[in-house]
Amino acid sequence: MPYVTVKMLEGRTEEQKKALVEKVTDAVSETTGAPIDKIVVFIEEMTKNHYAVAGKRLSDE
């Protein structure tokens, strides 16, 4: 049973997240042969103050 975690900044619409889950599920099924009903996708949304690149939080820019 494949488990996929997608970490991204908050702000996407419910429609975007739904499409993401569907496309990730399809891609995992196509590449691994896993049945769609066995694929689990987690979305973890982060705020800009919990995400940093090159030593700087995105909220500080």
Predicted features along the sequence, with ranges:
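A domain-level signal for the structural core that forms small-molecule/cofactor-binding pockets
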Residues: P2-E61
